[in-house]
C-alpha cells in the first residue's frame, strides 16, 4: 500500500515558519537584519571599536565619557577591547586630538586588573603608543601581592590620624565580608587593635621581646601586622606582651590624651580576661584581619609609595594587579578586600581634589576588568563613580565575564550604561537581560542573538549626542593583530 504522509507535502519538502522563510529568501528581513552601524559612528568620534564591510566603527567619546560597559563570556574579546580603549586614551595623552569630549592629556587611568598577563598587555599597548607617537603619561604596574614590587600605591592616607586609618581598614573589612559577618563587637576590637598598632615603636618592641621572644617583635612592620598580633595572631602570650609594652608607653608621664584613650581601649581586650575569654573576644576579628596581615608591605609606605592624590594630580596611569603575581599568591577573598580598600581610597581622593574637573577638561578613568570582584566588596564606590563622579571628571569603564555574579541592582546599572558592548553571553537569563537592553529603542533582539555571537563579535548599544541609536553588531579588532594600522585608524585627524 502507498504510504500517505500526514501532511500534504512532497516527501522531499519540509515545513518553514513564515519568519524562517523570510529570513532565507530575504536575509535583510530576518532576526539579525537592521543591525547596520549608525553613520555617525563611521567618523573618528572616539576609540576604535571594530570594522565591518563598510569600514571602521568607533565608540563616541561624548557618550563613553558617561560610562562604557563591556560584558561577555571568557575568551570572546572583552579584555582585548579594554586594552584597545586604554590604548586610545594613551594616544590622546601622547598627542591630544583636541576633539570635543576627547579625554586629551589631562586624564589619569586607574585599572583594576586581576591577572598579571592582563597588566602586561596594558604595558605593551602603552609601549606601542610611545614608539609610534610619543610617550603618554607615565604608567605604573603595581603587583599588590609582591612585596618586592617597586611601584606602590598607599592603601591608607598618610595625612589621616591613626584612628581614622584604623576605621578605614575596619570599614573595608566590613564591606568585603557578607552582611553581618563583622558584628559590632568585632568592629570595636578591630578599631582598637589597629589604632593601637600605630603606637608600636622600637622601644615597645624591645620591651615586648624581653617578655616573649616572638618573631613579630623584630624588624619593622605596619600597624596592620601589630594589630593582628594584638588580636592574638601570634598567640595569646605575644598579644599580652605587646599590649603590656604598649600600655607602659601610652600611660607614661607626659603622654597625651589620645594615647591614654588608646590605653583605655586596650583594656577592653587585655584587662581582666582569661586567655579563653580573650580568645572568644578576638577570634572572629582576628580571622578577618588575617586576610590583610600577609600584605603588610601595602600598609608600610616609604618614599616611593604613591598616593592616589599624586596619581590624579599628575594624570598618571596605574594598573593595579589584584591577583597572584611573580610567584606570590592571593586568594579571591584577599583580592576582594584589597580591591575594596583601593576603590574606597580612589573615591576619597577624587572627592578631595577633583571637584570641578569636568569643567576644566580634566579626567580620571577607572577601568574595572572584572566587575564581579569589586561589586561584592565596593558597590558604593562603583555606584558613586557613575552616579556622582561626572562633575569630578570620572569616566567609568566596567567589564565582567560573570554578570550573573554581579548583584542585581548593580547589574541593572551596568547594562544601562550609555554605551553597552556585549560579546557572547553563556547564561540564558543574562542573555535575555542584555537583549532587552539592546532593544530599548523598539528593535527586536532576542536572547539567541546574544548567545550565538561569534568570538570577537559584539552587539553594541550606543547613542550620538545623547540621542539613542539602534543597536548593531560589529567585529571587534585586536590592536596586536596590526598595531600600525590600529594606531593609524585611531589617529585620523589628530594633531600634536
Tell what function each PLM region has.
Residues 1-76, 80-85, 92-103, 380, ...:
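Basic- and hydrophobic-enriched, low-structure N-terminal and domain-boundary segments
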Residues 3-41, 45, 234-249, 280, ...:
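Conserved P-loop NTPase motor module
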Residues 33, 329, 442:
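A short, flexible N-terminal coil/short beta segment enriched in small residues
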Residues 48-51, 61-64, 73-74, 81-394, ...:
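P-loop NTPase motor domains
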Residues 59, 68, 98-99, 181-185, ...:
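P-loop NTPase motor core of the ASCE superfamily
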Residues 145-147, 402, 426:
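Short, solvent-exposed coil/turn elements at secondary-structure transition points
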Residues 399-405:
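Conserved H-loop
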